[in-house]
């Protein structure tokens, strides 16, 4: 819950605690992958979290009304305010490359679990990194989609399980 906490007010409004924690560790250690390792140590995380890329990217969404929203925390607010659903999400810059460790982890996994989580601002962005969708499709491990128990305002309003799965399949290819 702590790492998923999103600030509601002040200068940090809309920011995710986990992202800030990793950003601070990256600044301290000067290396994103090392920061993730340190996060594992600090929080005594069981298992291993492997980032898909170390590149600096911005998540963008094209809404059904044609407007483009840049920035993960701005997307749900814009969708709700404009009453226009997400048409597609993409990364800027395009052509983002994956970390070899991410592709290796996917290829060696017994099971690949997509979800639960924010569909358009957490799950699908990983699929936008070059080579990740290909690795998931070609990996021998079982693929499992775990849908959220409820919709998320500004991302999956009125979505059914079929809509959720269709969105993931669209980006998996």
Question: Each PLM stretch: what is its role?
Answer:
Residues 119-129:
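Glycine/threonine-rich flexible loop motifs
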Residues 146-148:
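Generic beta-sheet signal
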Residues 1-83:
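Electropositive, gly/pro-rich neighborhoods at or near active sites that engage anionic ligands
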Residues 119-121, 150-153:
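Short, catalytically relevant binding-site loops at active-site mouths
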């Amino acid at each position: 819950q702590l790492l998923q906490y999103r600030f509601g007010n002040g200068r940090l409004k809309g920011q995710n605690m986990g992202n800030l924690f990793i950003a601070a560790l990256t600044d301290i250690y000067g290396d994103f992958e090392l920061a993730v390792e340190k996060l594992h140590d600090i929080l005594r995380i069981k298992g291993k979290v492997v980032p898909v890329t170390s590149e600096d990217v911005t998540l963008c969404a094209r809404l059904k009304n044609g407007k483009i929203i840049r920035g993960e925390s701005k997307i749900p607010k814009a969708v709700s305010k404009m009453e226009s659903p997400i048409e597609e999400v993409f990364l800027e810059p395009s052509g983002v490359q994956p970390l070899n460790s991410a592709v290796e982890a996917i290829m060696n996994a017994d099971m690949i679990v997509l979800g639960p989580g924010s569909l358009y601002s957490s799950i699908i962005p990983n699929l936008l990194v070059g080579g990740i969708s290909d690795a998931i499709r070609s990996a021998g491990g079982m693929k499992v989609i775990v849908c959220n128990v409820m919709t998320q305002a500004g991302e999956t309003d009125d979505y059914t399980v079929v809509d959720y799965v269709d969105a993931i399949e669209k980006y998996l290819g």
